[in-house]
Amino acid sequence: MRKARVERKTKESHVLVELNLDGSGAIDVDTGVPFFDHMLSQLGKHSGFDLTVKTSGDIDVDSHHTVEDTSLAFGQALREALGEKVGIRRFGDAMVPLDEVLVQAAVDLSGRPYLVHRQPEIVELIGTFDTTLGRHIWESIVAEARIALHVRVLEGRNAHHVFEAQFKAVARALRDAVTLDGVAGVPSTKGVL
């Protein structure tokens, strides 16, 4: 089974992430940051991964450490669950609309962290969530998962929709990339990812 359990403890947060790439989209998320919970739930549901996230952090200061550490732990769990990446498709992409928003995401499970993220500048709160953390979420996931990720917001105005469509698009791209396609070995001429 392609599963991982990651626990991350710092002076700022305590994070537990359990991930099953071959799940059914079962989700149990509680970070103490409701909008971030909603986004992680989109990631679990639309990827088809089983995802459990439990975070306690210094949200009395703000949500930055909680969001960052949770994103790092998710990225690590994704990397560990993928293991040697034998038989996966490796590449995935998705185009996701959400009302007036259109987002494109593409992923390469390459072992090399790289992020291209294009979104209109959004500086506001969604509930208690600081939208300036958006890019940092993807940076943190990419760094620990060691993947190349491109996310482009092609159209959109509503901040909630812009964020939600990104998480759905990345989820669908990941779903494709982690799929076992029956081809023997690692999908690289190097023989390793």
Model-derived regions: residue spans:
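Structural preference for solvent-exposed beta-strand-turn elements
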Residues: 1-193
